[in-house]
Amino acid sequence: MENSCADAEFMVATPDTTADVLTIAGRSFRSRLMTGTGKYRSFEQMRASIAASGCEIVTVAVRRVQTNAPGHEGLAEALDWQKIWMLPNTAGCATAEEAIRVARLGREMAKLLGQEDNNFVKLEVIPDSRYLLPDPIGTLQAAEQLVKEGFAVLPYINADPLLAKRLEEVGCATVMPLGSPIGSGQGIRNEANIRIIVENAKVPVVVDAGIGTASEAAQAMELGADALLINTAIAQAEDPARMAQAMAMATIAGRLAFQAGRIPTRSAAIASSPQTGLVGQSPATV
């Protein structure tokens, strides 16, 4: 044979996803993967990973930047905010009142870094220091006030369909149900509830927290999520930049699979080849 598999050139098709944009509060993004800035071993790793991910939204913990917490000194200046949209978050806030104050600081921080029209805030109200599970009541209270103040609120919540709908009704720009506890790497443990949220939401659904590897990112997107926010799985990987690239590819793959529509799950096999003309089968009578 002149042509063998070993000699053949294989090309991986790169899908054109430019028309499939993510829109949040009237602003459009090409990438459906958001990343964070925490837990990296160095700023160099962080910058390389964010670049490899192709993300356009990066979340920043306002309190840690404001207080120059260890590992966050100079963080605000470490990235090119002309190319990346900042998503200030209220991590570290245990009450609605704290989260509202920190959200206001985050908006001012974004303005100082050149994003004058940035009203985005990732809302986190977490009084639980062990499991880092969000407070649904405090989150709703803070969201109501921040929406009144003109914020585009992206609330981090348990995968609670009723809470997600209530937050949508008060004017939140997205809902962000957790896949499993923050940093746990347990993957998607709330699949049924996330499906319900996706089916009923009229705002983007962003799965946030718990994703540990690329297959779980693809799984979340296959459920119909509009986007993902992934930090620990990238930052704490042995090779963060490579994991960031894997997560980016998985996000695209999962999105395409959701749009394509998977086959139904059946209890019995269905042959993919014709059942006529089998060896040993009698010819049809003419």
UniProtKB/Swiss-Prot annotation:
Read off the InterPro entries from this record. Answer: Aldolase_TIM, Thiazole_synthase_ThiG, ThiG
Q: Name one GO cellular component term.
A: cytoplasm
- Spell out the subcellular localization from the entry: Cytoplasm
Biological processes annotated in GO: thiamine diphosphate biosynthetic process
The protein's enzyme class: transferase
Q: Which UniProt keywords apply?
A: Cytoplasm, Schiff base, Thiamine biosynthesis, Transferase
Q: Does the keyword Nucleotide-binding apply?
A: no
Q: Does the keyword Transferase apply?
A: yes
Q: What does the entry list as the binding residues for 1-deoxy-D-xylulose 5-phosphate? A: G183, A209, G210, N231, T232
Query: What Pfam families does this protein's entry cite?
Result: ThiG (PF05690)
Identify which residues the record assigns to the active site. Answer: K122 (schiff-base intermediate with dxp)
Pathways per UniProt: Cofactor biosynthesis; thiamine diphosphate biosynthesis
Q: Which CDD domains match?
A: ThiG
Q: What EC designation does it have?
A: 2.8.1.10
Reactions accelerated catalytically: [ThiS sulfur-carrier protein]-C-terminal-Gly-aminoethanethioate + 2-iminoacetate + 1-deoxy-D-xylulose 5-phosphate = [ThiS sulfur-carrier protein]-C-terminal Gly-Gly + 2-[(2R,5Z)-2-carboxy-4-methylthiazol-5(2H)-ylidene]ethyl phosphate + 2 H2O + H(+)
The UniProt GO MF terms for this protein read:
thiazole synthase activity
Q: What does the record note on quaternary structure? A: Homotetramer. Forms heterodimers with either ThiH or ThiS.
In the record, the note on similarity to other proteins reads: Belongs to the ThiG family.
Q: What the protein does?
A: Catalyzes the rearrangement of 1-deoxy-D-xylulose 5-phosphate (DXP) to produce the thiazole phosphate moiety of thiamine. Sulfur is provided by the thiocarboxylate moiety of the carrier protein ThiS. In vitro, sulfur can be provided by H(2)S.
What's the protein here called? Thiazole synthase
Source organism of the structure: Synechococcus elongatus (strain ATCC 33912 / PCC 7942 / FACHB-805) (Anacystis nidulans R2)
Identify the gene encoding this protein.
thiG
